[in-house]
């Protein structure tokens, strides 16, 4: 095994590195780092900048000397080239071309603390005792539980692991035994001893990564401030292997908060990781909501406010603390974000926390790539922020579309960068620009026979591959590999579902399965011998593997797309507005070019004139309505649903895709590009079930549509998949029950027709008043509470949900419940006139129960009619109008005319 780093810090002129040695042991070394920078020179040199100019290395005796030299160069107007982030330079110098790491040696700690107080504990003040800490260690695979038995709020008895294992009805907490077997429980009589022992644990088992849910915003600052208050600043600094713990106040739209860094340890808040890498929009990002969504298990339930739980049920309090930590572990097992951070960090050769910034990530990737070629990176420049054009989105008609095929360009912006060869050093000048519609129509003159061009007017070298295209290609192929793995697992899951539908067998021994490989026909035939239980467990394994692969491919997609964004970001070393504009304008022309070509082709096939077959389209895809094609061949030729879907599939593969490829090759030749990389493949096949009254698909507006998809990228579904975009079902503000009801309504619109929708509407209207209040409440984000707070009452132009927040504050005053802060998600219910709360609505923290002291009053005054009309009827009416149907049966006068 080779050495690999787990932490890099600068201390004066030295680098302090924590690393894993060849025997898997953690070591620390302090190195006097001698950086090398570069300047332009006239003499011939093996070192060149990205433009081919000669560069001379400048080796410095210390990092301070290097920084002083850079400042002097700036003062006289000369460029100081090379990597000025000496942590990145050190990693590159020390570890060379590729870092091979072993995840099992990287110590990851996952922590959650509990604090009991009269009011919600402020981490900046840390005025209440920490009375419980659960700290999970990945190398030990143990939960270290620190329990304060005697506090200012009274004494409690020890937590009992045997009782924790029992069922709730037996007075237990239903904590799984496999978790309890890994708990090391440590009770303490006073907080001072508990905190000292916790610091000792840190020093003995110091994490490389410290994570947990919202630890950056709460747990870390509370622990640091509390330790500083009780044990002193020297004790607080013991958390850092180099004795350096720093804090800073940051201002955001919600006010100020204190953020701590523990040098030598990477603090990665799992809430931040989830928000950045999950691409999942939820009504609440509380741990309970996310855990329920990801693992189908919530937090442990308890009665009353959390600040009373320790004294009323200390046993549940500690079990609750343990399960909170386990919930984060369970989410990571599914999502794999810690592994993602490690793989991206070691690929880029940068500290773990850098992956949160795509600009830092790409700076490191490009630096290391160029270094291997003796190329020197440019100095970070200073630029004025300017806007540039975005993508083109087609304006769809708000109507139903029965037969739809979508076609999608593979990684559009990265492909444009590679096709045109867009990079700072490949720019070769300008050509005379014609109006964009002339390039779309192909009537403008060919810009150049020598250089690769973009319709924004800039020309690029065709022969030497640019640094930006070269690096983006590497990550592109990584993403392609992960997407292939994801696709294999998804196809396997669908294949097993079809086996279950045909009837399972009797074998109950689970077979060995090779991950990320598509099952062979022989293996699928063999699977028909297994029981439904075994097959369902295999489906679950396939879906988990697909989720992990999806995380990896999605985040590589975001990384390669972020390079386009970085090119237009003034803080990026390779910022160039000409390049950012070249990408977007080429994209605008490219998508409208193919829309023109598709219309020309289908008008010819169908024998029509000027028919617009493009139902919709956006940055990198078009949705083609093939109703006329189906009309031409005749719907009666299809005996089964799969016959129709397969016809559309073959038409897409054998007719449309080749035509599209030829069209994009024409564009490549027209722009004289380096290579043809605009590859557009068939994505979705959407249609109603054969013989049904469903509409198949409909659009409401740009990027707002619903499709009944039978095949997605050659993955044939056992049951049609609803592809819903931009509708209220996707919005986190829509109540959970209404989301589900709207989704079912959409399914009926697409698959069954008007009568079915009307029947469902009548039934749901009756059920609505009986639903739990939490699933019908709207979800909003509470911002600018203080702005609209007029002595506890709503001020001028106060938003509806902020009125609810103020109502809640008045109602719970003195109850000791957690306050609603700016930025918190809240659930909102309208109230009927005459209610005891004195306003139109009430709002409380999302994902929680209303306090029992006010719950019954709120429930008896809910304005169900207003809420039903606003949250369900209004969006449903818009959908039905677009689909050409009514959600309610309308009275008719037809009977008068016989």
Curated annotation (Swiss-Prot):
Residues 702-705 are annotated as: Binding of DNA in B-conformation. Residues 101-337 are annotated as: 3'-5'exonuclease. Substrate binds at residues 411-413, 479, 557. It comes from the Viruses. Residues 245-261 are annotated as: Beta hairpin. Keywords: DNA replication, DNA-binding, DNA-directed DNA polymerase, Exonuclease, Hydrolase, Magnesium, Metal-binding, Multifunctional enzyme, Nuclease, Nucleotidyltransferase, Transferase, Viral DNA replication. PANTHER family: DNA POLYMERASE CATALYTIC SUBUNIT (PTHR10322), DNA POLYMERASE DELTA CATALYTIC SUBUNIT (PTHR10322:SF23). Interacts with the polymerase clamp; this interaction constitutes the polymerase holoenzyme. Interacts with the helicase assembly factor. Part of the replicase complex that includes the DNA polymerase, the polymerase clamp, the clamp loader complex, the single-stranded DNA binding protein, the primase, the helicase and the helicase assembly factor. This is DNA-directed DNA polymerase.
